[in-house]
């Protein structure tokens, strides 16, 4: 086979055997180089604060792990989520353990603390949000079947690592969304679920 590099493309000649026939094919393969941080063109924290956000609020219902809280902040920053509501026992910034996982996203993503999750849900409903519990429940809609209205604002309630979303919160939500799972475990980590 012949190989030459031109304009950051690699030209490769290779033989392929399909159904007993030998075919000679030439393909361009892009040379993949990891980008440097300076090449990513990310927003500054100041520009992020002023940027347009997606109309989504993440509600954390009694999340006990500081690492999970930090991960949710980092994911929310990546997708420009409008805000995070921290409820009940969920820890709030500033916190060194949250910062360790969030890598500063707790300083860019807006957040608000509520003593009770139902109080946060009531506020969201009054402000016109469609509130969705992410939970395994009777009548839940599988994520791959979910139809969203792009003209609406949404809030997703993420439950405690052991008990999930409180039933009194589920009762006050517009819909339950369930992530299909095909293995042996009953649930996913809450920060992974938020990312999905």
Where on the chain are the PLM-derived regions?
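Short, small-residue-biased leader/transition segments that mark boundaries at the very start
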Residues: 1-5
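Post-transcriptional modification and biogenesis factors for structured RNAs
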Residues: 13, 17-196
